[in-house]
Every structure is written in structure tokens, then in C-alpha cells.
Amino acid sequence: MIGRLQGILLEKQPPEILLDVHGIGYELLLPMTSFYNLPEIGQETVLFTHLVVREDAHLLFGFSAKTDRTLFRELIKTNGVGPKLALAILSAMSVNEFAYAIEHEELSKLVKIPGVGKKTAERLLVELKGKFKGIKQPDFFVESSHVGAVDPVTTSPEVPAEEAVAALMALGYKASDAEKMVKRIAKPHLTSEQLIREALKAAL
């Protein structure tokens, strides 16, 4: 299994990137919480990875921290949670925020994530509560509103709003909902990644 990749970032279009590792281009899917930490195109980056093998495709997921990958692996063990839904969850919340929501049984926050209905949220609470010791960080149980945001390092796309909408749709939001989310927080100076981060934050 591929567990770690170090290479040059060739392309990035949320939530996908293309990474050049010794002449081989790896396509990876990243949660937005990891996407925000990417360097500029042409620079080197290191990602922890998880390979999902399906009959129709091999999907490689990338994470900027081992804790993110560990949570991803815990999520896909949960009944009813596949890799794409786990990606959406990790895009909507950081590891700290998700852990806080689980430990404090914040069902209302979980159901706001696309693809997470009441039954799935309840299942997450039952199956994951108390399982975060292995991925605990110093500020692991800080309430989500107090967790510091990570400033993204991004390129400047020509049409950031359209790219933000496309990324939100890839994460499971309906087109109409994604457009509304972006319009509510759209400002001329924001990049697509900043728009995505603000839209996801506002959705919760």
C-alpha cells in the first residue's frame, strides 16, 4: 500500500491534485482541511496517503497530517460511511472540530455535512465516541469555534467562485446549494480555496 508521497505539485483543482514523484504523476483526492496547506504549484510537498481499491477504480486519498489520515480510516470503518463521505466530513471539519462534535454529541453540526443524515450522524456518535485517544492532539477537544483557522497558500484562479462551486459539488453538495453557499460569502479578493473554506465554515 502507498502510505506516503513526496513530490512536486503539478496541478490543483479542489479536491484533486496531481503530484509528480520521480516522473510519475499521482492523482490524489484531498479533504479541504489538507488542501489549504498545499504549497504553490511547482513546489515540493509531502502527503500521507490511503489507497482505496474498487472494482471500477483505484482512488488515492492524500492528507497533510497523519491525524487526518487516521480519522479518515476510522470514518470508513463506520457502517454507511464510504471514502467520498469521509472526504466531505474532513473537508467540513478539522480533526479537532470533529472530535469535539463527537465527544459532545453535537448531532446538529454533523447533519449539516452533505451526505450525513440523522441516522448516519447517530451511528458516528455511537461508533466513534471514545476512539480518539490514538489521534489526540494538544488542543484536540477545543470547541470548534475556538480552533484557529489555517491560512491557505493558494494560486489566484480566474474564476474563483465557479471553482469553489465545482469543489463543493465534488464534496457532495447539490449545485443549487453550492451556488447559494458561495454567493453568500463571495468577495472579489477571495481565492477559490478561501471561498470554499468560508462557505464550509458558514454551513456549520
Swiss-Prot record:
Compartmental location: Cytoplasm
Biological process according to GO: DNA recombination; DNA repair
Cited function: The RuvA-RuvB-RuvC complex processes Holliday junction (HJ) DNA during genetic recombination and DNA repair, while the RuvA-RuvB complex plays an important role in the rescue of blocked DNA replication forks via replication fork reversal (RFR). RuvA specifically binds to HJ cruciform DNA, conferring on it an open structure. The RuvB hexamer acts as an ATP-dependent pump, pulling dsDNA into and through the RuvAB complex. HJ branch migration allows RuvC to scan DNA until it finds its consensus sequence, where it cleaves and resolves the cruciform DNA.
Main location: cytoplasm
Keyword terms: Cytoplasm, DNA damage, DNA recombination, DNA repair, DNA-binding
Region of interest called Domain III, as start-end residue ranges on this chain: 156-204
The protein's assembly and partners: Homotetramer. Forms an RuvA(8)-RuvB(12)-Holliday junction (HJ) complex. HJ DNA is sandwiched between 2 RuvA tetramers; dsDNA enters through RuvA and exits via RuvB. An RuvB hexamer assembles on each DNA strand where it exits the tetramer. Each RuvB hexamer is contacted by two RuvA subunits (via domain III) on 2 adjacent RuvB subunits; this complex drives branch migration. In the full resolvosome a probable DNA-RuvA(4)-RuvB(12)-RuvC(2) complex forms which resolves the HJ.
Stretches for region Flexible linker: 144-155
Pfam families noted in UniProt: HHH_5, RuvA_C, RuvA_N
Protein family according to the UniProt entry: Belongs to the RuvA family.
Region Domain II: start-end pairs: 65-143
SUPFAM superfamilies per record: DNA helicase RuvA subunit, C-terminal domain, Nucleic acid-binding proteins, RuvA domain 2-like
UniProt free text on domains: Has three domains with a flexible linker between the domains II and III and assumes an 'L' shape. Domain III is highly mobile and contacts RuvB.
Presence of keyword DNA damage: yes
Superkingdom of origin organism: Bacteria
Name listed for the protein in its UniProt record: Holliday junction branch migration complex subunit RuvA
Organism from which the protein derives: Mannheimia succiniciproducens (strain KCTC 0769BP / MBEL55E)
UniProt xrefs under SMART domains: HhH1 (SM00278)
InterPro entries: DNA_helicase_Holl-junc_RuvA_I, Hlx-hairpin-Hlx_DNA-bd_motif, NA-bd_OB-fold, RuvA, RuvA_2-like, RuvA_C, RuvA_C_sf
GO molecular function: ATP binding; four-way junction DNA binding; four-way junction helicase activity
Gene3D superfamilies linked: 5' to 3' exonuclease, C-terminal subdomain, DNA helicase RuvA subunit, C-terminal domain, Nucleic acid-binding proteins
Gene field: ruvA
Region Domain I: start-end pairs: 1-64
GO cellular component, one term: cytoplasm
